[in-house]
Design a protein with these regions (language model features):
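Short, contiguous pre-domain boundary segments
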Residues: 2-4
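A glycine-rich, hydrophobic loop/mini-helix early in the fold
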Residues: 42, 46-86
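Acyl-donor binding region in acyl/amide transferases
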Residues: 85-93
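Active-site segment of metal-dependent pyrophosphate-handling enzymes
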Residues: 67-70, 103-141
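Acidic, metal-coordinating catalytic segment for phosphate/diphosphate chemistry
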Residues: 6-58
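Residues that flank catalytic or metal-binding motifs in active/ligand-binding sites
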Residues: 15-17, 46-48, 82, 115, ...
């Protein structure tokens, strides 16, 4: 049984959702639809990956999540705490705070978050889907 959503189902769900197209230096080039950004070889777009951790004694525990079936790319995979494709006008840290609350119910203050680095990658999935992102890695406790 294939639980993965069809292109038509995803297009209906994300029809109005836009992402920010960028070059390799995070300069804005415009916007495009979320589905367009993830089909075939994808369109380079702005994203963040948030990794939350907590100290337990002398060890750090990472908060992971399993990606939802509604995700166009890599549904059901285990991943970082939260990741997201930014829409036009959204800023990295404020959107990371609001998105982790929406997705995980976790309340985080922006002051505990740090932007570590950005990297660009392209990772094809099965069935014609692809992540093609300039990803800002954010960590917090």
């Amino acid at each position: 049984m294939n639980l993965r959503k069809t292109v038509e189902e995803l297009d209906q769900k994300y029809h109005d959702r836009k992402v920010v197209m960028v070059d390799g230096n995070d300069n804005e080039l415009g916007s495009c639809g979320l589905i367009e950004a993830h089909r075939d070889s994808g369109v380079k777009h702005r994203a963040f990956s948030l990794q939350l951790y907590r100290l337990v004694g002398d060890k750090k525990e990472l908060l992971l999540q399993q990606r939802a079936v509604e995700k166009p790319v890599f549904p059901f995979y285990w991943a970082n705490t939260c990741c997201y494709n930014l829409a036009p006008g959204e800023m990295y840290l404020p959107r990371a705070v609001s998105r982790v609350k929406e997705e995980m119910g976790v309340v985080v203050d922006e002051s505990v978050l740090r932007e570590l680095y950005k990297f660009s990658y392209c990772s094809p999935d099965i069935e014609g889907w692809c992540e093609n992102e300039l990803d800002n890695v954010i960590v917090g406790e």
